[in-house]
UniProtKB/Swiss-Prot annotation:
This is UPF0301 protein PputGB1_5045. InterPro entries: AlgH-like. It comes from the Bacteria. Belongs to the UPF0301 (AlgH) family. It comes from Pseudomonas putida (strain GB-1).
Amino acid sequence: MKTLAPSYLKHQFLIAMPHMADPNFAQTLTYIVEHNEHGAMGLVVNRPQELSLADILEQLRPDEMPPASTSQVPIYQGGPVQTDRGFVLHSSECSFQATVALEGLSLTTSQDVLLAIAAGVGPKQSLITLGYAGWEAGQLEAELADNAWLNCPFDPEIIFGMANDLRLEAAAASLGINLHLLTSQAGHA
């Protein structure tokens, strides 16, 4: 008997289904950074907070005035885990102290990336989050089996080229799905 290798969702999007009850994930689009037999990690990419890069820089360096342009750089709620920790998902032309190479992207957790972005010498494309989404071994698979999520291929244009309020619908549209037409009710024949 042939056993199938597990299928993991690293470098894909998770689209929260319209009936998602968890307020941490309702109406979210999540980029999956890692997914393996030990669990999964992702970053919610469509939930801006009431913070900007300027606010973060003021906390990191209270004696220095951040550049005015940093007040236009939003900070996203990456998920409910470690919400005081920063994660920067960015294009891969730059590397920093704590950078992990992903498929065509990089993820950095060190402050030097924030300073580079503020100075105008950072990555061409970036998305800054506080916190991340985490799943224990088998948890994400169970949620997928319960139809809490749809997965779709990653498209950098959705993160880096669209307004945050368009990202969820754009990811669903890449599958030919209109989220407004989905229901959580099953039909009976």
